[in-house]
Amino acid sequence: MNWYEKLSEYFPIEEMKSKAHMEALLKERSDIYHKDEGKHHILMFAEFDSFIFVDYLYVSKDARGQGLGGKLIAKLKKKNKPILLEVEPVDEDDTDTEKRLRFYQREHFKHAQSIGYRRRSLATNEVNKMEILYWSPKTESEEEILEAMKQTYENIHTYKDEKWYGESYEKTDEVLEIIDEEKQKNIFDQLS
C-alpha cells in the first residue's frame, strides 16, 4: 500500500486532500510542504517561516503505543516554532478520535478555544467542524494562531483547489473566525 492509500484508509474522506493535490504541493511547494515517510509512519507537514502545520500524522496499527508519534512530534518541536494541527471533535462511534486527542494532550498541545473552524468538504459537500490544537515554545496568542491557520488554509488547503476539485473552497473568513467567549469549550474536557 502506498503512502496516499494508507492516509486515505485512516483519515475520514472529508479530511483528505486528493492525491493530485498532495503531489502538487510536494512538487510545486517543496519549499514549504514536506513528507516524512517510514515503514510505520507518514508525516505530512508545511513549514513556514514562523510556524509548522501538521497536515497528516499516521502511525501504523502495529507501531502505535511505541512512542513513534511522540518522536515525530519531538523532531518538529526541535525546530523551535509553534506547531499547529486540526483535529475532529470526539466521536463516540470512532474511538480513534479520542485516542488522537489524548496523544496530543500528552504532547502538551493546547486547544485554540477561541477559533471557530468549519469548512465544507469538496468530497462529501458536508460542513465539517474541526478544532485547532497548537504547541509553542513561547507564549502565542490565539490571534497569532488564527493568522497562521489563515496562511495554512490559503497556501495549503486551497492550493489550486479548482484544478483538483472542479470548484473552490469557501473564502478564508467564512471558514476561520474568532468565536464568542460563552461558546468556547476546551476540547480536552471531552475526554473521559
UniProtKB/Swiss-Prot annotation:
It is an enzyme of class 2 (transferase). Keywords: Acyltransferase, Cytoplasm, Transferase. Disruption phenotype: Cells lacking this gene display decreased survival rates during salt stress conditions. One of its GO terms (cellular component) is cytoplasm. Its EC number is 2.3.1.-. SUPFAM superfamilies: Acyl-CoA N-acyltransferases (Nat) (SSF55729). It is found in: Cytoplasm. InterPro entries: Acyl_CoA_acyltransferase, GNAT_dom. One of its GO terms (molecular function) is acyltransferase activity, transferring groups other than amino-acyl groups. Residues 1-139 form the N-acetyltransferase domain. The lineage of its organism: Bacteria, Bacillati, Bacillota, Bacilli, Bacillales. Its main location: cytoplasm. Induction: By different stresses, such as ethanol, salt, and phosphate starvation, in a partially sigma-B dependent manner. Transcribed under partial control of SigM ECF sigma factor. It comes from the Bacteria. This is Putative acetyltransferase YjbC.
